[in-house]
Amino acid sequence: MVVMPPQNSVNESEGRYLQDGFWQHGRFYGSWKPGKYLFPIDSEELNRLDIFHKVFLLARDNKPFLAPIRRTSPRIMDIGTGTGIWAINVAEECLSDAQIMAVDLNQIQPALIPPGFMPKQYDIEEPSWGPLLADCDLIHMRMLLGSIQTDLWPQVYHNAFEHLTPGIGFLEHIEVDWIPRCDDDERPANSAFVKWAELFLDGMDRFNRSVRVIPQEHRQMLEATGFTDVKQEVIKAYVCPWSADRNEREIARWFNIGLSHSLEAMSLKPLIEKLGFEAEDVRELCERAKRETCVLRYHTYCNIHVWTARKPGPQQ
């Protein structure tokens, strides 16, 4: 049965609204094309997505994008916009004359939006992006791993390519590699965070919606699609603020908050529905991982991957 969440679970102060959906495993999920988006859409999840916007800004010198925009009234698409925070940030602070289409499977964007901001509910796994904005200067994609069927990534990149302006259209794609890493072995021998990541990745593989970041595969897919000037950047995000570097500490503070909100939200469905866990066991593992990521002597980090690519002109 489709139900609406209790009124007090909606973050009204930010003018957001939730579409029809359903409760499962103690969280609220969207009901449009159920099973495609495996993570919640409740107010706690909206906060998580906004926290990661801050993480990515800090990791990229407070710049929401790096692609050169050459037209005075650019056309931009934000694919998998979530709360719309990136698109709103660009519209309000960077490109006030831009036409920005914010595309997502779920209608969780705010009711009050800036001029030029166009929310669009659409399934980007469709073979064609016909209804979406064409002739784009920039297409931005972020944290889509797990939301795209694993074998459909070439199709997604192809559709992005087709909707960019030849010669000046750029794609920017950002993902978090959830595999915990450590350069100095300063982490516990039986790490709960490592265990969580292994199970989470395994469960998502079984949904055929992999969250594994394989950098060379994405580069090869972009080049095979026809993109040129393909570049990749890797940024460390420590899970707690132990570093002597001020910027690394600030990224880590926000990443720690985002991670603490992510553990349960992302792993409930894959661990319960694909690996046979009980909900309380998932939450217990997440709590242990959360406590571990707050210990300053553990120097664990995750990598943030950024790919940028350009659609060549007709003579290139």
From Swiss-Prot:
The lineage of its organism: Eukaryota, Fungi, Dikarya, Ascomycota, Pezizomycotina. Methyltransferase that performs automethylation. No other methyl-accepting substrate has been identified yet. Component of the velvet transcription factor complex that acts as a global regulator for secondary metabolite gene expression. Controls the expression of the gibberellins gene clusters, but does not affect bikaverin production. Controls the expression of the fusaric acid gene cluster. Acts as a virulence factors during infection, most likely through activation of gibberellins biosynthesis. The keyword Transcription applies. It catalyses: L-methionyl-[protein] + S-adenosyl-L-methionine = S-methyl-L-methionyl-[protein] + S-adenosyl-L-homocysteine. Belongs to the methyltransferase superfamily. LaeA methyltransferase family. Its main location: nucleus. GO terms for molecular function: methyltransferase activity. Component of the heterotrimeric velvet complex composed of LAE1, VEL1 and VEL2; VEL1 acting as a bridging protein between LAE1 and VEL2. Interacts with VEL1. It comes from the Eukaryota. Keywords: Methyltransferase, Nucleus, S-adenosyl-L-methionine, Sporulation, Transcription, Transcription regulation, Transferase, Virulence. This is Secondary metabolism regulator LAE1. Gene3D superfamilies: Vaccinia Virus protein VP39. Disruption phenotype: Reduces gibberellins production and subsequent virulence during infection. Reduces both the fusaric acid gene cluster expression and production of fusaric acid. The gene is LAE1. It is found in: Nucleus. Induction: Expression is regulated by the VEL1.
